[in-house]
Every structure is written in C-alpha cells, then in structure tokens.
Regions:
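PLP-dependent amino-acid enzyme catalytic core
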Residues: 1-313
Length: 313
C-alpha cells in the first residue's frame, strides 16, 4: 500500500506558478497563480486527499478495504476516488444535487457510491451515518491533514518568490486559505485576503445568506479549519463576475480556469495591491454545463481589466 501511495505522490504537487501581467484603472499589476489542474485528477484537492489518506493509514484510522466516506462539492471526492483505487478502498460520496453534472459523472466513472442530497447539512448527516457503520470519514472541513497538504503548496510558492506581499483565496474547507496563508504570513508577514461569494456572505455574516454559483466556495458552513485570526480582509465577489473573469482568463490568455479561479483573480484585482499570489484550483472542464458557457452572463467592470500576458516563474 505504501509503495502505491509513493507512486501516486509523484503525480501530485509541484504545479506551475505563472505570473499574470494585467492592467486595471491604467495601472500595471501582477498576479502569481499556481495552476492546480496539473495535479493527478486536475485540482488542488489531490494534495489534500493524498495527505488525508496517507495520514489515516499511518495512524491506523484507515485500513485496506475499509470504505472511505466524504462530504464534498466534487473535487475532493474525485481526488479520493482516484487515490483510493491504489489503496483498495471503496468510496462513498455525499454531494449536493446542485453541483455540476460533470462532477457527478466523474464520480460515477470511478465507481463511487454516490448519495445525492438537497444540501450540505443533509450531506453531513448522511456521512455521519456511514461513519457509524464503519466507514472512515475524512472530515476535510476539520482534518488538519488538509492544512498540512496546503502548507506544502505554500512552500512551493515560497521557493519561487522572494516575497509574497498578499495572498488571496476563497474558502471552502479552509484548507487552502489557512494552510497557505498561515505559512506565508509567518514567513513574509503576508497580507491574507479571504474571498466570500457576495450572494452568500458566509464569512461576514456567519451564516449563508443565499445561493451562489462559485462551486467549491462557501459550502453553507464556516469550516472548523477557518482561522479568522490570520485574515486581514474579506472581499466579496459576485458569482457572475467570477464567471466572467474565468471566461476572460480563458479567452484572452488561454488559461482554462474554473469559476473559483475567476473569483480568486478578481479578489487580487479588487485588493488594490501591486502584487498578489493566489491559486487556480481547477480548470473549466467540470463546469461546461454551468453558466461558465453562457454568453448572456455579463459583467460591466470586467471589461476594464486588460489581461496582457503571462509567464512561467
């Protein structure tokens, strides 16, 4: 089992870091973004899923053939399914019906047992039932292995950049923002900015105020991993603006990013900072059935952002 995990580890991490040069309000600025779709299954969640499974085996909490269960908006589930194939663990996924059909079909293609439910609270309730029946519940919203995985991402960023003045990221489980943010703040005194879907206002209100379309962010609860003591600012991004920004990154630069990446990039723009680092958590292939391909979605101020070029750092 360990040998198989070691093989998988070689296909996770060490993703490209690009520097995107853009102009906003006639000022040239820069965003340094990790392209996380270069991971095993195409998302940043491969890092967390690997670390969670590895640590669970190491501590004896997970054994071969034992079912793995998780609540997910999609990417973590896909990552778990792939990695669990080499450890010979069946996977049970509890996912809201509102997630993209591509995510659900991908989960089915791995042979996962899927529980489609109305919302995240129902997903957590169902997952707890499976845990009582003997499944290993990953609990990515509170599992410190999630933080550990993204600390490695932070170290990859730090290896490429002499300084990181600002780091911007959305919050789903909190693993990415806190894992990367905490390390960078300690090393560089980096300003940490959290992205909150404008329709939900979860981080500012403590409870979701409405539905949004940025899958992977604001999953109806503030995760236990979220550490507000390291957060310097919260920026709200409207779903349609995030979608338009993701489309623009693809159309103008050829960077085929997912919706949350559009939100992260916009957060960098609206921060007013000269230089920001962020992550592009996945690509656009899981969102082709969503408004990401809807030409009627418009954003007035996105046109004021001129994407000039990108280079590999």
């Amino acid at each position: 089992m360990n040998d198989n995990l070691n093989k998988v580890e070689k296909m996770i991490g060490h993703t490209p870091l690009v520097c995107i040069e853009y102009k906003y309000n006639n000022i040239i600025r820069y965003v340094f973004a990790k392209l996380e779709w270069f991971n095993l299954t195409g998302s940043i969640k491969d890092r967390s899923a690997f670390e969670i499974i590895k640590d669970a085996y190491k501590t004896g909490k997970l054994k071969e053939s034992q079912p793995i269960c998780e609540v997910t908006s999609g990417n973590m589930g896909i990552s778990l399914c792939s990695i669990a194939k080499v450890t010979h663990n069946p996977v049970i996924i509890c996912i809201p019906k509102t997630m993209s059909i591509e995510r659900i079909k991908l989960l089915k293609s791995f042979g996962a047992k899927i529980e489609l439910l109305d919302n995240f609270p129902q997903c957590f309730e169902k997952a707890n039932e499976y845990e009582k029946q003997g499944a290993y519940l990953c609990k990515q919203f509170e599992n410190k292995s999630n933080i550990k995985a993204q600390t490695k991402t932070a170290k990859e960023i730090a290896k490429k950049l002499d300084n990181v003045p600002t780091f911007v990221s959305g919050v789903g489980t909190g693993g990415t923002l806190i894992g990367i943010g905490r390390y960078l703040k300690k090393k560089y005194n980096t300003k940490i900015i959290a992205i909150d879907p404008k329709e939900a206002k979860l981080l500012t209100c403590g409870k979701s105020q409405g539905k949004h379309k940025i899958q992977g962010l604001s999953d109806e609860i503030i995760p236990k991993l979220y550490d507000k003591t390291i957060i310097d600012e919260i920026i709200e991004i409207a779903s349609d603006d995030a979608i338009c920004m993701a489309k623009k990154l693809c159309k103008d630069l050829g960077l085929n990013v997912g919706i949350s990446s559009g939100a992260n990039f916009l957060g960098c723009v609206l921060s007013g900072e000269q230089s920001c680092a962020t992550v592009f958590a996945d690509d656009n292939k899981k969102y082709l059935s969503t408004d990401l391909t809807n030409d009627e979605i418009k954003s007035d101020f996105i046109d004021n952002i001129e994407l000039i070029k990108y280079s590999i750092v």
